[in-house]
Amino acid sequence: MTTSRFATFDIESETGLTPGAYPAPLPTLEQQLHDRNAILAAIPSLARAKLDAATLKRRFANFLLTLGMVGTTSKGSYEELIIPPVKGMGSSTGFRARELVQIITSSPAPPGFDGNQTLRQFARPYAPQVQNMIAQGKFKTNLYDKYGKSVGAPPHVCIDFNDAMDLQMFHSTAEFESAHKVRELAIAEASARENAPRPAANPRAAKPIIGQTAPAFHSGDAAKQSGGQPVNIKPSLAQSAGFDSHRPPPETPPRAGTPSSQKSGQSGQTTIQPPASHGILSGMLGSHKSTPHSSPQQTPKK
């Protein structure tokens, strides 16, 4: 019986395979992506659709959990094997099972390998092919970009979260479970950010459109700035006169001795001059034509 480099798992007793030399040259892309059923047939003990967490921890702890031969559902449970790829995980990495079988069955183990080192040294020969396949669009990288970094997976060999699980060595099943919790938290946080309600636009912060007339402040009004402090607005000249362009001028009785009360030498009647049609400026210029903003001229009451 050949002792596996993983202390809790024996290759021959579980797979029926005899350790052999690592193939050289590297298998071609077509060979790696060949019929997955052949892989399942070569590893009878792994060719089961579902395994509960207890079985995985008991029988395949260091083998499956460290090599990532098990996928997770959206709830994070150890439910399905990665051979073939887990449905819904967005993984097209079923070929990796062939690589791992070749790695595991290679002999002898590297000197000093104690089962707690990363598998980066074993995956490195495949890195050029992995990068080449990424360039060909064979893999999706979004899962790794979002979640793979949370478990410290090496980016040059990891192309999605399944790869992060495949190529990251954990010291214990507890460490593996902790990494899954980190992943679930990352998924939850990303989902919360995507589904968070957008803050409503602040109407006070909106800038006026070019050409739009800003509302005038009337005498005695107080505008609040962003700090919430009231600001006394100085009334304009028109407001000082008692009216502005937004309010019709009030009817004021004429006072004797004022310029607005003049006696006509011909009729002897008192006539009331209407106020300027467009504020003080128009009155100074002597313009009495009505404008869109002017109030209707008042005629003397008989």
Curated annotation (Swiss-Prot):
Compositionally biased tracts (Polar residues): 288-302
Location(s) in or outside the cell: Virion
Keyword Ubl conjugation: no
Domain of life: Viruses
Region (Disordered): 217-302
GO cellular component terms given for this protein: helical viral capsid
Main localization, broad class: virion
UniProt KW keywords: Capsid protein, Helical capsid protein, Virion
Record's compositionally biased regions (Low complexity): 254-271
Functional note: Capsid protein self-assembles to form a flexuous, filamentous capsid (Potential). The capsid encapsulates the single-stranded RNA genome.
Protein name from the UniProt record: Capsid protein
Species annotation: Botrytis virus F (isolate Botrytis cinerea/New Zealand/Howitt/2001) (BotV-F)
Lineage: Viruses, Riboviria, Orthornavirae, Kitrinoviricota, Alsuviricetes
